[in-house]
């Protein structure tokens, strides 16, 4: 069984700094069998903060430090080979799916326009660590 905590985090990236490189498992608890589903609500490009990934990073180990907004564990830049970075541009409704160990972040939004995305987390129904109290849950049986 798989569930999604229907806490669609509405990622609003207005004029802002970039999102540091990170792996979701550095701040997720419980079962590592989770997936993030990122749904673009408008066109995403380099100017408005497109996401970026390092292919194969889920098979590597990275040193984490506490850095950035919210004190979420993020990666030290020197641990990352930026030449391997793949920037993802997306259209409205495009979906990006990644596992908890995939290294990712986003570019700085310098467009002057806001960028929105909905982020869902899918996880085993036995894992209550990522559930948010008071929010509906979707379950596939």
Question: What are the roles of these predicted feature ranges?
Answer:
Residues 6, 37-39, 118-122:
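A structural signal for short, well-ordered beta-strand segments
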